[in-house]
Amino acid sequence: MAEPVATPTVELSGVRKDYVAGPVVTPVLHGVDLTVGAGEFTALMGPSGSGKSTLLNLIGLLDRPTGGRVRVAGLDTAALDDDAMARTRGRTIGFVFQFHHLLPAFTALENVMIPMMAARGRAAPDMAECGEHLLRQVGLGAVLHRRATQLSGGQQQRVAIARALAMAPRLVLADEPTGNLDTHAADEVFALLREFNRRAGITFLIVTHDPRLADRCDRIVELVDGRIVADGPHRRSGA
């Protein structure tokens, strides 16, 4: 008997996105087709202004396309109202950004607990246990109760990774997660993302300008002027 085929984590079909300012319409994405399978570790590359952040916003259920279809974890976003999109986003997707956006007055543990408290509307003892477990997994067991401002840049980004994993997402979207780090810290953070991908089967889509890191992904998707121009295990020559 054949093994069941896992539902792709991301499916985009003919996706277009225009931004409208009065009478001016600015097309940003032009008929993008993209499928990201469950458990893939994919880099998204392209020059500034190519539409990478716009694409990530659509996949992250932070915006809706002008045309085409977006499916995340098997759900067609066209069938979801705004509340349902927010619930799906909270349950299904984790985010890691170049700027970690930690609350400076909160401890590492409190920052990781924020998504859990937002989902339940209150704090609970099991949240602290989960947060501690995640922070230990990212190597921060010794600084659980240290405020964000007392942590190094690499440590702060590790807290952000733990926070992104707090709701056990199927998909993590990482937008330049190593952009503010030195080479050593960037390698450590990238290795952590890869470890969670391999150990937990989480799908990762990582925006990066760093070809050295992109080459360590399973797949590289290149976006230029709102169109996918390459998709495979290697970058285009000279890209």
From Swiss-Prot:
A GO BP entry is: lipoprotein localization to outer membrane
Show the GO cellular component annotation of the record: plasma membrane
Q: Which Gene3D superfamilies match?
A: P-loop containing nucleotide triphosphate hydrolases
EC number(s) on file: 7.6.2.-
State the similarity comment: Belongs to the ABC transporter superfamily. Lipoprotein translocase (TC 3.A.1.125) family.
The record's function comment reads:
Part of the ABC transporter complex LolCDE involved in the translocation of mature outer membrane-directed lipoproteins, from the inner membrane to the periplasmic chaperone, LolA. Responsible for the formation of the LolA-lipoprotein complex in an ATP-dependent manner.
What is the protein name stated in its UniProt record?
Lipoprotein-releasing system ATP-binding protein LolD
Q: Native species of this protein?
A: Anaeromyxobacter dehalogenans (strain 2CP-C)
The lineage is: Bacteria, Pseudomonadati, Myxococcota, Myxococcia, Myxococcales
